[in-house]
Amino acid sequence: MGRYRVRVVTGAWLFSGSVNLVRLWLVGAHREARLELQLRPARGKEEEFDFDVAEDLGPLQFVKLHKEHTVVDDAWFCNLITVQGPGMSAEAVFPCYRWVQGEGILRLPEGTARLAGDNALDVFQKHREKELKERQQTYRWATWKQGLPQTIAADCKDDLPPNMRFHEEKRLDFEWTLKAGVLEMGLKRVYTLLRSWNRLEDFDQIFWGQKSALAEKVHRCWQEDELFGYQFLNGANPMLLRRSTSLPSRLVLPPGTEELQAQLEKELKDGCLFEADFILLDGIPANVIRGEQQYLAAPLVMLRMDPSGKLLPMAIQIQPPNPSSPAPTLFLPSDPPLAWLLAKIWVRNSDFQLQELQFHLLNTHLVAEVIAVATMRCLPGLHPIFKLLVPHIRYTMEINTRSRTQLISDGGIFDQVVSTGGGGHVQLLTRAVAQLTYCSLCPPDDLATRGLLRVPSALYAQDALQLWEVTARYVNGMVHLFYQSDDIVRGDPELQAWCREITEVGLCHAQDRGFPVSFQSRAQLCHFLTMCVFTCTSQHAAINQGQLDWYGWVPNAPCTMRMPPPTSKDDVTMETIMGSLPDVQKSCLQMTITWHLGRLQPDMVPLGHHKEKYFSDPRTKAVLSQFQADLENLEKEITARNQQLDLPYEYLKPSRIENSITI
């Protein structure tokens, strides 16, 4: 018995409030009390009410909500409810962060994180079991394409659960900026109708509007070997380059290149030889766009690192050797300038395909979706790992669903302008799954495997390792609050089910690629969770943001090639290059889409700065605060370093890393 102060917090998004009447009950260990209030929640408001309750409720366990409606079911987005009452040293927090709609009564448990075996009262165990049963009906797996990771069962964005949808501001920004980009694309096409299109300088006719300062530098310097090599370290795709441990077996050195062979062997001996092998593209069928055949290649690039840290190309073999064909041509920096330039353009086209499909779509978006669906199906809201992960899966299901219906769908953007479209992209993704190993998602392992540790000019590698360590400290801090021993990890049935769901269901039996099917220790759990958070945040930032800078100037990363790869160095002319590069329509669409997808989002939530209060324990707040402080310190370090560089690396500054995959 006594006075209770109840605070109701409504979301600030458009349409978060409701004209419907909301009823509340306080549920304690002894009994429950219906509160006599007339609440019609208003967007962005915190509303407080005082109530005298005649009976002793006991320790508070739940708040119950019921939104009444007659004609219109006006959904309400409730952030949280707090209650301060007799004998309570601090207010009890009841997190919600979801839409309240329909006829039912919603039960919000008190927000203290609890493991399945920690429930002193059976009522919490029954609640989490009921919650998971309902979630498993709502969040169902589906197969988008055989051989690829499972996805959320949704044919379009409207099929998604409401709590996984974009909020209204996000939806409007996404759709209106896309329309603005299409309008700009149309203006560029009209502008070029009566103008020539036979020189590289003619791309200037469409290189206006939405672009970045780095894109301007790429525009000026893209033909330079130094910038070509730099992109393998710190560009849109820093994931393919590796230090050579031997000369690749597919490298064919024709007669007369003995000096090159000696130079390659010297660089190899000195540990300065690197390679980028696009063999994954070999045999992938190229697209046919509006009746016009497009072309693909599977290049091999050999590069050396000079004493100053510059990565410079030594040779390019555009296609792998084929027993039924003459030996592939080996292109060298000493070749006629146009021949060497066209060879580099072919490499950049191949890099576009792998960056977008293997390292962006598969290794971040689809992996994050598996994590998201498994989290919703296996971890109840009271579970500490749910509370840890849920801020990092915001919007991921909708952006991926939109991708499957607009970008990589039949007739979508890839089919319209990309050389792997028309089905080749699905074959490429299926091949790439074999390379999707657990180690490949963990920078300490991946960078060690690729020989890129302690390379001073590898800025992605440096920043990724530091972010991994900062994220790992955060995860370790949270995990050790709730798992005091390895036995508790092994004995958590919900956690073990979540692990199996990711590896065996979502990733389609990925244990043969190193993914765990169970957690045997706190260290193993922490490593896996660090991978999850890193993939959904830092890794996506590194791969996504570069599109705007490196793909805006189309010749630097053409989405498609309209002529087959050259077999002779002497026949390459400017007409050959312009005939190979995308035409006006494809170039305009490439610029539009890469700007739309690569720009910083206006509603961006930086890494670690989510406002949702899923945890209520002061100890967890301290761990999160330390994470934020570590990120701030890293931001200062990166900023200071970048001030000394001609070409700053910005993608992994914590302030530019989004807290989840939202674009």
UniProtKB/Swiss-Prot annotation:
Q: How is the cofactor bound?
A: Binds 1 Fe cation per subunit.
In what residue span(s) does the Lipoxygenase domain sit?
Answer: 114-663
The residue ranges of the PLAT domain are 2-114
Q: Name one GO biological process term.
A: negative regulation of apoptotic process
The protein's UniProt keywords, in alphabetical order, are: Cytoplasm, Dioxygenase, Fatty acid metabolism, Hydrolase, Iron, Lipid metabolism, Membrane, Metal-binding, Oxidoreductase, Phosphoprotein
Pathway given for this chain reads: Lipid metabolism; hydroperoxy eicosatetraenoic acid biosynthesis
Q: Domain of life of the organism in this record?
A: Eukaryota
Name positions with the PTM Phosphoserine. Answer: S246
Classify the main location: cytoplasm
Q: Provide the binding site for Fe cation.
A: H360, H365, H540, N544, I663
Q: Activity regulation here?
A: Activated by EGF. Arachidonic acid conversion is inhibited by (13S,14S)-epoxy-(4Z,7Z,9E,11E,16Z,19Z)-docosahexaenoate (13S,14S-epoxy-DHA). Arachidonate 12-lipoxygenase activity is decreased when PH decreases from 7.4 to 6.
- Catalytic reactions on record: (5Z,8Z,11Z,14Z)-eicosatetraenoate + O2 = (12S)-hydroperoxy-(5Z,8Z,10E,14Z)-eicosatetraenoate; 2 leukotriene A4 + O2 + 2 H2O = 2 lipoxin A4; 2 leukotriene A4 + O2 + 2 H2O = 2 lipoxin B4; (5Z,8Z,11Z,14Z)-eicosatetraenoate + O2 = (15S)-hydroperoxy-(5Z,8Z,11Z,13E)-eicosatetraenoate
Q: What does the sequence similarity comment in the record state about its family?
A: Belongs to the lipoxygenase family.
- What name does the UniProt record give this protein? Polyunsaturated fatty acid lipoxygenase ALOX12
Source organism per entry reads Rattus norvegicus (Rat)
